[in-house]
Amino acid sequence: MSTHRILPLSLLALLCLLWSPPQATAADTVHLIVFLENGIGTAGQAQKYVDKLIETARSKNGWVKAEGKYVTRRKSAERYVKQKKPAFGFVSLAPYLAWRKSDKLEVLGVADVERAGGRRYHLVSKTASGLAGCKGKKVASNHLDDPRFIDNVVSGGAFTLKDFDLVKTRRPVQTIKKVIKGDAVCALVDDAQVAELPHIDGSKGVRSVWKSADLPPVAIVAFSSASSAERAKFKASLGSLCSGANKATCDKVGIRSIKAADESTYAQVIKSYGN
C-alpha cells in the first residue's frame, strides 16, 4: 500500500479517536439513596420504580448518569453511604436524625410516602387496655435499632424502652404475629403496620392501646458530597418529580407528593432527639 494512502487513513483514525463523545465515568455518576427504614415490602419490589424516579431526577438535573438504591435496613443503608457517597437521599425520620450531624445532611424537601411508616407509632395489644398494661411486660418490636429515637422522640416522655421486656424482631409482620401468638403482650409498631392489621391472619382483636404524636415525613436531603449548585438545582426540581407524566411512577413507589422544605420542618424533633 502506498504511503499517500496510509497517512490519510491513520489521520482519520486519530480524528475519530479525538472526536469520540465522552463516556460517563464513576466520577460523573450521581448516587442517591432511598432509605425507608423498616418499610413494608421488599427492596426488590420497589427498586425498579425507584430506578424510574432516579432517571427522572437525572433528566431534570442534567446529570450524565445517576444510580440509586432502595433499602429498608440501617446497616445496608450505612454500607451504601460509605461505599457510594451519595449526593442526595430520601431518608426516614430516625436515620435522618441519627445522621444529621455526622453526615452533614441538609434538608431540601419532604416526601409524603404511602406505607412508608414512621409518621406515628403505636403500642398494639390483644389483652392490654393501655400503656400501663404494656409496662413490665413482653413488648415485641422491629423498631429497636435506635433506642434514642424511641425514648426521646416517639414516646413523648410517656415511657422508655427500659419500661418493657423487649422482644426484638426483624420483619414488620413478624412483630404483630408475636402478639397474635401470645409471645408478647404488646408490640411497638408504626402506622404502616397498623394499616396492615386487617390483612394479617389472626389479627382480630389486636388494636392500638397507645399512639404517639404525628411526626414529620420522609426527609429529602443533600449529603456532603453535593455542591451548593447541585443542591440548589435539585431542590428546584423537586416539585416536578411527581407531576405530569412522572406521577404514575411516583404512585408505584407510593409517593403522594414531593415538595421543597428546609430544616425548620424538623426543628422540634431535632430538639427532642438531642443533637
Where on the chain are the PLM-derived regions?
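Bacterial N-terminal signal peptides
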Residues: P8-L18
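A ligand-binding cleft/hinge motif common to bilobed small-molecule-binding domains
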Residues: F90-S102, I180-S208
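Bilobed "Venus flytrap"/periplasmic-binding protein-like clamshell domains
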Residues: F35-K60, A94, G117-K177, K181, ...
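Sec/Tat signal peptide C-region and signal peptidase I cleavage site
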Residues: W19-A26
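Acidic, polar ligand-binding/catalytic clefts
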Residues: V71, S76-G133, D145-P147
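Short helix-initiation/N-cap motifs at beta->coil->alpha
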Residues: E67-R79, D165-K177, D214-P216
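Extracytoplasmic small-molecule ligand-binding "clamshell" domains
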Residues: A27-L97
